[in-house]
């Protein structure tokens, strides 16, 4: 009885982990590679920042199954991506395409960085070239007094 229980404990967890893995039969290695690339490129609609290859959500399982079906029908990668974008929106792509809607996503950070550098350059330039209105200039009497003070200090 103890041996049977020990065997069940040792073999049981391995079977549970094995049952959770999706298995698909591919025609060739190129198709398997395309499937892997597509599932890594597409984001799970339910999960935040997780691709459908790594997600355990039911919708990710459905999307993997759908990609496998479309690959079997002979559709190319762009057709599959277009289908997913039409169905779930641009959010489903980790790297959204450069369009009018996504231009701000691609160029916004660089534009903000450039604007910050320009603002800093203007501030520095204005501080360096601040015009003196003569308020800090010494009058002839003050200059004479300053020279006297400096001369007495050097004589000591």
Swiss-Prot record:
A GO cellular component entry from the record: plasma membrane
Subcellular location(s) per record: Membrane
Membrane topology: Single-pass membrane protein
Superkingdom classification of source: Bacteria
Keywords: Cytochrome c-type biogenesis, Heme, Iron, Membrane, Metal-binding, Signal, Transmembrane, Transmembrane helix
Family to which this protein belongs: Belongs to the CcmH/CycL/Ccl2/NrfF family.
Stored PANTHER family: CYTOCHROME C-TYPE BIOGENESIS PROTEIN CCMH
Protein's name in the database: Cytochrome c-type biogenesis protein CcmH
The organism of origin for this protein: Pseudomonas fluorescens
Lineage: Bacteria, Pseudomonadati, Pseudomonadota, Gammaproteobacteria, Pseudomonadales
